[in-house]
UniProtKB/Swiss-Prot annotation:
<dbReference type="GO" id="GO:0035176">
    <property type="term" value="P:social behavior"/>
</dbReference>
<dbReference type="InterPro" id="IPR003652">
    <property type="entry name" value="Ataxin_AXH_dom"/>
</dbReference>
<dbReference type="GO" id="GO:0043569">
    <property type="term" value="P:negative regulation of insulin-like growth factor receptor signaling pathway"/>
</dbReference>
<feature type="region of interest" description="Disordered">
    <location>
        <begin position="298"/>
        <end position="402"/>
    </location>
</feature>
<dbReference type="GO" id="GO:0045892">
    <property type="term" value="P:negative regulation of DNA-templated transcription"/>
</dbReference>
<dbReference type="GO" id="GO:0060252">
    <property type="term" value="P:positive regulation of glial cell proliferation"/>
</dbReference>
<dbReference type="InterPro" id="IPR036096">
    <property type="entry name" value="Ataxin_AXH_dom_sf"/>
</dbReference>
<dbReference type="GO" id="GO:0005829">
    <property type="term" value="C:cytosol"/>
</dbReference>
<feature type="modified residue" description="Phosphoserine">
    <location>
        <position position="81"/>
    </location>
</feature>
<dbReference type="Pfam" id="PF08517">
    <property type="entry name" value="AXH"/>
</dbReference>
<comment type="subunit">
    <text>Homooligomer. Interacts with PQBP1, UBQLN4 and USP7. Interacts with ANP32A. Interacts with CIC. Directly interacts with RBPJ; this interaction is disrupted in the presence of Notch intracellular domain. Interacts with ATXN1L; competes with ATXN1L for RBPJ-binding. Found in a complex with CIC and ATXN1L.</text>
</comment>
<dbReference type="GO" id="GO:0034046">
    <property type="term" value="F:poly(G) binding"/>
</dbReference>
<feature type="region of interest" description="Disordered">
    <location>
        <begin position="1"/>
        <end position="36"/>
    </location>
</feature>
<dbReference type="GO" id="GO:0042405">
    <property type="term" value="C:nuclear inclusion body"/>
</dbReference>
<feature type="modified residue" description="Phosphoserine">
    <location>
        <position position="229"/>
    </location>
</feature>
<dbReference type="GO" id="GO:0045944">
    <property type="term" value="P:positive regulation of transcription by RNA polymerase II"/>
</dbReference>
<keyword id="KW-0678">Repressor</keyword>
Length: 791
């Protein structure tokens, strides 16, 4: 006859039925009876193990079948329990009923291949601190990575095999980690802390680390502190975060954050395809070699090899310390992982905190309006005001990095389509056109002094990165900071380099490190390693008045449509262009005197222009190139010209005949364009007014109309002030003006018949000697006092 308990058990639904202890296999019996306090959990979880399906069905037909049907009804727990099974720990704790689990944990995708069931005994030090209502679900879903490798030999096998997990198995691990991470967002309490066994460490696998000796027995407490935004914030983490355990040495974390015998810290590292396996602490020598190897790989032509070291990640969250998050959306996510050596590397006298790199990026789930509101709300006063003048958006990254305070974030524009140096497109890091925050400043939490007197600084990457020191004005050069860090053995154990955006080839990367303080109350400080670029002055920046077409490789279009490089131009090109073109003619000027000007880098050249050899003196930069008949490009200072333009040229000397192509039908005559390269407009004018396009158009026989202000152009040409020394090649800019002719004045288009007649008459002289033209007296005088009229 059935007892009352059996009858009541049959009346219950299958999922709530209880299998008698006497009808279970012996292996389940031993596992289910560690203590009376876990009776409820044993009832909830043991029916879902594959052992029930394998043994219970044969030995106890009805009970096993009903238990299996109940297992199928538990849709939320089917894949999870089948993938990995854990026996309850021996430590007593409060456990909620099993019916609360479906509301807390979402199930993974059905049909996921599962790995064999392994039993792992949790150590007695594995405790749950925080809200009691969430303690139980943690126990059932602790992934194998958090289980002590020394607790059970079976667990060690699981840990060793975790490095070769398949994608399906990895999805289970990600699901478990998501459960742990999402639990922190269900309450506004100071966060839930999970204390794994002392030997537990999480790190990247695949050759990055080597297992070493276990840590000293004194290191008993370690935490994975899950600090996430409250559920009301509505922020959805697209990739599942995987907890990464940082080393909880007491010198690495502010003591104000310690809630137990040791400090707690967590890094949630979302890996889109990567996985983490537990490892034991490495030896001091191995850790030192690991750090050196990572530092060597960190910078490769200024690019971070992140994809190879940490996997191609799509999102990373760095949460350090206190979980005092407010119910506000967090618009930023930090995108880096901090690497810590083993505790053996830190002696009692070495209190330097660990240094890590942080890259804060906008959260794609946060609207742009909320982002702006966050930037305004979290705007800081001290270092931020320094950058507000330049229009940068500054603000805290949504209270994400709690231990790193105070800090300033620098937001710079970055094209979302531009590939980043980590090997992923920009859209893999942030969505749309929302620019990332790629600067980070670690400030002082207490009275902290930086070892070596390193100043705080901000680095704004870009085409010309800007380094802004903040505080400690005694040191101006950040390069000294890097030297101090690398040369000091105190910080040799924690080297780290961080490079953000792709920068020009000419940049020299000089990583700047914010060294943590030597004082005992050490805090975790983010080390900003950003490139400092030594920009090479281009010719346009060095002397803005010089035309860019003098640069080597510039393409010049001849009158016949042929394209030539500026360094390949020859005298025949000038002559041929003058013959073909209806608008252009060759003008020549003879150098009579070259003197240095009162201004540095400027030369005064006196030319004899035209048939009457009118004397015209012009101030010109020493590197300005002229085209000399039968010789090519020449300047007063060929070395300077070659340095700025990479244009090979000769030394300009007295007696050289400079030729240029000029317009025939200018109002007051044609201004001689000393530059054969660019067309009909005066080279000097181009240099001063930057009218290169117009001159090129005229040179290419485009009918843009004759410039009526050519006389002023000539004046401006003679007025050119180039801050260069004599000796640079200058293009023939000598301006020649032929007597004004009424027909030329009336007819402004190249098709005018009078212009054609003039062209024939002017082309009659032999090609070997260009026909000179006269400069009117008025034009000479209007060279703004810089021209000396010949007697």
């Amino acid at each position: 006859m059935k007892s009352n308990q059996e009858r009541s058990n049959e009346c219950l639904p299958p999922k709530k039925r209880e299998i008698p202890a006497t009808s279970r296999p012996s292996e389940e019996k031993a596992t289910a009876l560690p203590s009376d306090n876990h009776c409820v959990e044993g009832v909830a979880w043991l029916p879902s193990t594959p052992g029930i399906r394998g043994h219970g069905g044969g030995r106890h037909g009805s009970a096993g079948t009903s238990g299996e049907h109940g297992l199928q009804g538990m849709g939320l727990h089917k894949a999870l329990s089948a993938g990995l099974d854990y026996s309850p720990p021996s430590a007593p704790r409060s456990v909620p009923t099993a019916n609360t689990l479906p509301t807390v944990y979402p199930p993974p995708q059905s049909g996921t291949p599962v790995s064999p069931v392994q039993y792992a005994h949790l150590s007695h030090t594995f405790q749950f601190i925080g809200s009691s209502q969430y303690s139980g679900p943690y126990a059932g879903f602790i992934p194998s990575q958090l289980i002590s490798p020394s607790g059970n030999p079976v667990t060690s096998a699981v840990a060793s095999a975790a490095g070769a997990t398949t994608p399906s198995q990895r999805s289970q691990l990600e699901a478990y980690s998501t459960l742990l991470a999402n639990m922190g967002s269900l309450s506004q309490a100071p966060g839930h802390k999970v204390e794994p066994p002392p030997q537990q460490h999480l790190s990247r696998a695949a050759g990055l680390v080597n297992p070493g000796s276990p840590p000293p027995p004194t290191q008993q407490n370690q935490y994975i502190h899950i600090s996430s935004s409250p559920q009301s914030s509505g922020r959805a983490t697209s990739p599942p975060p995987i907890p990464v355990h940082l080393h909880p040495h007491q010198t690495m974390i502010p003591h104000t954050l310690t809630l137990g015998p040791s400090s707690q810290v967590v890094v949630q590292y979302s890996d889109a395809g990567g996985h983490f396996v537990p490892r034991e602490s490495t030896k001091k020598a191995e850790s030192s070699r690991l750090q050196q190897a990572m530092q060597a790989k960190e910078v490769l032509n200024g690019e971070m090899e992140k994809s190879r070291r940490y996997g191609a990640s799509s999102s990373v969250e760095l949460s350090l310390g206190k979980a005092s998050s407010k119910s506000v959306p967090h618009p930023y996510e930090s995108r880096h992982v901090v690497v810590h050596p083993s505790p053996a590397d830190y002696s009692s006298r070495d209190t330097s905190g660990v240094r890590g790199s942080v890259m804060v990026l906008p959260n794609s789930s946060t609207p742009s309006a909320d982002l702006e509101a966050q930037q305004t709300t979290h705007r800081e006063a001290s270092p931020s005001t320094l950058n507000d003048k330049s229009g940068l958006h500054l603000g805290k990254p949504g209270h994400r990095s709690y231990a790193l305070s105070p800090h300033t974030v620098i937001q710079t524009t970055h094209s979302a389509s531009e590939p980043l140096p980590v090997g992923l497109p920009a859209t893999a890091f942030y969505a749309g056109t929302q620019p990332p925050v790629i600067g980070y400043l670690s400030g002082q939490q207490q009275a902290i002094t930086y070892a070596g007197g390193l100043p705080q600084h901000l680095v704004i990457p870009g085409n010309q990165p800007l380094l802004i020191p903040v505080g400690s004005p005694d040191m101006d050069t950040p390069g000294a900071a890097s030297a101090i860090v690398t040369s000091s053995p105190q910080f040799a154990a924690v080297p780290h380099t961080f490079v953000t955006t792709a920068l020009p080839k000419s940049e020299n990367f000089n990583p700047e490190a914010l060294v943590t303080q030597a004082a005992y109350p050490a805090m975790v400080q983010a080390q900003i390693h950003l490139p400092v670029v030594q920009s090479v002055a281009s010719p346009t920046t060095a002397s803005p008045t010089l035309p860019p077409y003098f640069m080597k490789g510039s393409i010049i279009q001849l009158a016949n449509g042929e394209l030539k490089k500026v360094e390949d131009l020859k005298t025949e090109d000038f002559i041929q262009s003058a013959e073909i073109s209806n608008d252009l003619k060759i003008d020549s000027s003879t150098v009579e005197r070259i003197e240095e000007s009162h201004s540095p880098g400027v030369a005064v050249i006196q030319f004899a222009v035209g048939e009457h050899r009118a004397q015209v003196s012009v101030e010109v930069l020493v590197e300005y190139p002229f085209f000399v008949f039968g010789q090519g490009w020449s300047s007063c200072c060929p070395e300077r010209t070659s340095q700025l333009f990479d244009l090979p040229c000769s030394k300009l000397s007295v007696g050289d005949v400079c030729i240029s192509l000029t317009l025939k039908n200018l109002k007051n005559g044609s201004v001689k364009k000393g530059q054969p390269v660019d067309p009909a407009s005066v080279l000097l004018k181009q240099a001063k007014t930057d009218s290169l396009a117009g001159s090129r158009h005229r040179y290419a026989e485009q009918e843009n109309g004759i410039n009526q202000g050519s006389a002023q152009v000539l004046s401006e040409n003679g007025e050119l002030k180039f801050p260069e020394k004599i000796g640079l090649p200058a293009a023939p800019f000598l301006s020649k003006i032929e007597p004004s002719k009424p027909t030329a004045t009336r007819k402004r288009r190249w098709s005018a018949p009078e212009t054609r007649k003039l062209e024939k008459s002017e082309d009659e002289p032999p090609l070997t000697l260009p026909k000179p033209s006269l400069i009117p007296q008025e034009v000479k005088i209007c060279i703004e006092g810089r021209s000396n009229v010949g007697k």
